[in-house]
Structure formats: structure tokens, C-alpha cells
Amino acid sequence: LGIKMAVPFYQVQELIQQHDVAVFSSNYALYAEMSRRFNNTIQQFVSAKDIEIYSIDETFIELNSYSQTDLNELAQEIKATLWQWLALPVCVGIGHSKTEAKLANHIAKKNSYFNGVCNLLHMDLCSKEALFQHIDVAEVWGVGRKLAKKLHALKIHSVFDLAISDPEQMQRKFSILMKKTILEL
């Protein structure tokens, strides 16, 4: 039906009624327990010191000490184990920065070609640029729909457009956070 996560109920109430969608309230105790199990499972593959729990449903792993590891294989193993042990469907994004990793995760979710794992570290520059040209700038971590409208007005429509923009100029127009985001792409 195209209902995005975290959309307020009142915004989709009519659509829900039209399609007879079942709605359930959140069970945060269960989510917290599943999050704990999720992160414990990840510790079967990487050191706890390399894990940063970002939110109840998001974790970053620092991969610098795993340079001799096939990261695609590791990600697929983690993904398969989380499904087998916890029945949690996950996608994995691998990048040079948290911003790039979140973008890679978005790509993995939206493109079945990647089989749930998008590794931007080993993607050649031409492929990466081609991919970024087809992703709306609103998908970049920290940009969102409101800021994307302002970027669109500046002819910055895609992730690629943002990545090649002048970080200093964008800092002057927006903020230091925008500059940092650009430098992380």
C-alpha cells in the first residue's frame, strides 16, 4: 500500500480503512528484548568493542579491524543467522562512513539485486556514481523531505548531486552538518 514506517496513524487512516488493514499497538518491551538478542547475535561474529548500538533497531559495526575478512560473506552470515535464530529480516549496508553505510542499507532494502547486502567499499567509482544518480537526495541520512525541497531548488536532486556539491558553499547555505554529510558521501 506504500505506507512508510513511522507515519502517524491519522495520515493513513483512510487508506487503512479502505483496505481493511489490521493495526496493532507497539510492544516496546518485546522490541527491546529483540534488540538485545539482535546485538548479542552480532557479537557471535564481531567484537563487542566494534559494535555501536545506535537505536532499538539499528547498529553500526566498526570494520577497520576486519580488513582480512570478506565483508560480503560476513554480512550474509550475520543476516542468515539473524533470520535463523530470531526470524528477523535484516539488510546490511557497508560504507566508508555511517552516512554511506546507511545509504548502502537503503540500497540493499530497495534493490533485490544486492540480496540484502550492499557493500559500497568494493564498488567501483563508476558503478557507485551511477547508483547515486538514481537515489533522491531525501534518502541521505539527515536530509529528509523538508531539506530535500531546499536542495531541489538548488538543482541538487540526487545523492550524486549532493556528493559533488561544494562542501564549503553548502555549509554557508545550510550548516556544518551538511558539510560533514557531503564529506561522508
Feature names for model-found ranges:
Residues 21-24, 47-54, 71-75, 83-92:
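Short secondary-structure capping/junction motifs at helix and strand boundaries
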